[in-house]
Amino acid sequence: MTTPSKFRDIEIRAPRGTTLTAKSWLTEAPLRMLMNNLDPEVAENPRELVVYGGIGRAARNWECYDRIVETLKQLNDDETLLVQSGKPVGVFKTHANAPRVLIANSNLVPHWATWEHFNELDAKGLAMYGQMTAGSWIYIGSQGIVQGTYETFVEAGRQHYDGNLKGRWVLTAGLGGMGGAQPLAATLAGACSLNIECQQSRIDFRLRSRYVDEQAKDLDDALARIQRYTAEGKAISIALLGNAAEILPELVRRGVRPDMVTDQTSAHDPLNGYLPAGWSWEEYRDRAQTDPAAVVKAAKQSMAVHVRAMLAFQQQGVPTFDYGNNIRQMAKEEGVANAFDFPGFVPAYIRPLFCRGIGPFRWAALSGDPQDIYKTDAKVKQLIPDDAHLHRWLDMARERISFQGLPARICWVGLGLRAKLGLAFNEMVRSGELSAPIVIGRDHLDSGSVASPNRETEAMQDGSDAVSDWPLLNALLNTASGATWVSLHHGGGVGMGFSQHSGMVIVCDGSDEAAERIARVLTNDPGTGVMRHADAGYQVAIDCAKEQGLNLPMITAQR
């Protein structure tokens, strides 16, 4: 028996156009989106199957990838493929309205849900870290997080700077698949940004894709640029090669005062995602193989230094927030007792949106034709004519966001509007206005699909932060509603032991049957978010549930 391979020197791109390589669009869609996750324009390290987020993979190994592709090409429209941590393990007869693929990634019994145990399983070829959209085949590059980051910066600007970020700057770190959205999001929100990254290859990736505007040669140069651009009122993003655990304390020592501080390094995974201060990347990767315990310790010690600097900025009155990478938890475990003194971004800025089921609705054009996305942009504006903020986002996205892989769009909308848009897109496919079917999905970071006490469900007003029934119910309901593929993951965003979350994707192929599935899925999916927040006592969610006619027996029947 040959050893499974996690490396292959190959370039993968999803097919374009209308010629099927599978038996129907319901199986062609997951096939193309799996391949799109590994497109070199999309993935961070596609030759090792890594899509984003440390070691977030699309398949467990290359042999599993090959078999998934072969199986999808042969799958019938009354069969369902089961994928267990990136490995295709079974095909079963179901029915036409069942999902074509069901995916479970990285799930561990809670007592064993640690990085140490997961890494043992991973080394034996028994598990795969799916992050959120890596192992669920609906990653669309950094655009997938741009609008959420933009909405966060805009809301922070409203709360702290009267809604005007002109002449202000954001300090952050991490330019990977998620963090790479920060510089563009800050620019779109009207602010300058200084973005620290320890790998030159990632800076090059963001410069190429126009997510970051320019690179400074050193810290002094970066600060000079920040001073010049903020004085001129320009929103320019600057990348700086370096280590945040070294640069942030130096900025504190110098008395430099940003206008906002956050972080999107891959701190959730100390073994693979956070470079210890004073180490080279090569040393880090080598020692991860030979002495993983020492690497984890060194990384977490550096995170503690990093968080202490963030706390120092907060104590100066600078708005400072965690952007969901669990760095506060890591620092607390290294003795920073007050690591949670600064809030996470969801309770600080995003939760009111979640209460109305508003979250990261996204779609991709299976044709590969950008015009299909531009036509859907226009349709969104037509169907939501009075939302100037949304229109501005779509205009900025078209102007500034480069497509990575298959053309795609992210657009935060909520209960009611998601189904309305999905049905309209399906009709555009039916009429031939779009040249091929569209897939609609979302991040697992959504209002009803995640339990993550250090991120999406931090500081719930009823104390239900760690209750993970909700993402399980979300996955079950999306399966019953007829989503094309459904995923249930553990550990995304914040690492092993700290989150459970689910995802769904639905195909708009222009058929009447698709319209029925779309209406169910795109109503029920955001509906679970409103339900979850209404159950926690949020009045905004309770009001939304009543307005939208949700049947919540313990709430809408009584209040």
From Swiss-Prot:
Q: Quote the record's binding site residues for NAD(+).
A: 53-54, 131, 177-179, 197, 202, 243-244, 264-268, 274-275, 323, 493
Q: Which cofactor does it need?
A: NAD(+)
Q: Which molecular function term from Gene Ontology is one that the record holds?
A: urocanate hydratase activity
Per UniProt, the keywords (alphabetical) are:
Cytoplasm, Histidine metabolism, Lyase, NAD
Where in or outside the cell it occurs: the entry states: Cytoplasm
- Transmembrane spans: none
EC number(s) stated in the UniProt entry for this protein: 4.2.1.49
Predominant subcellular localization, coarse grouping: cytoplasm
For the protein in the UniProt heading, the enzyme class is lyase
Please give the catalytic activity noted in the UniProt record: 4-imidazolone-5-propanoate = trans-urocanate + H2O
Q: Name one GO cellular component term.
A: cytoplasm
Kindly identify the residues recorded as the active site. C411
Q: Name one GO biological process term.
A: L-histidine catabolic process to glutamate and formate
Q: In which pathway does it act?
A: Amino-acid degradation; L-histidine degradation into L-glutamate; N-formimidoyl-L-glutamate from L-histidine: step 2/3
Per UniProt, the cofactor note for this protein states: Binds 1 NAD(+) per subunit.
State the function annotated in the UniProt record: Catalyzes the conversion of urocanate to 4-imidazolone-5-propionate.
What protein family does this chain belong to?
Belongs to the urocanase family.
What's the protein called, per UniProt? Urocanate hydratase
Q: What species is given as this protein's source? A: Pseudomonas aeruginosa (strain LESB58)
Q: What is this protein's gene name?
A: hutU
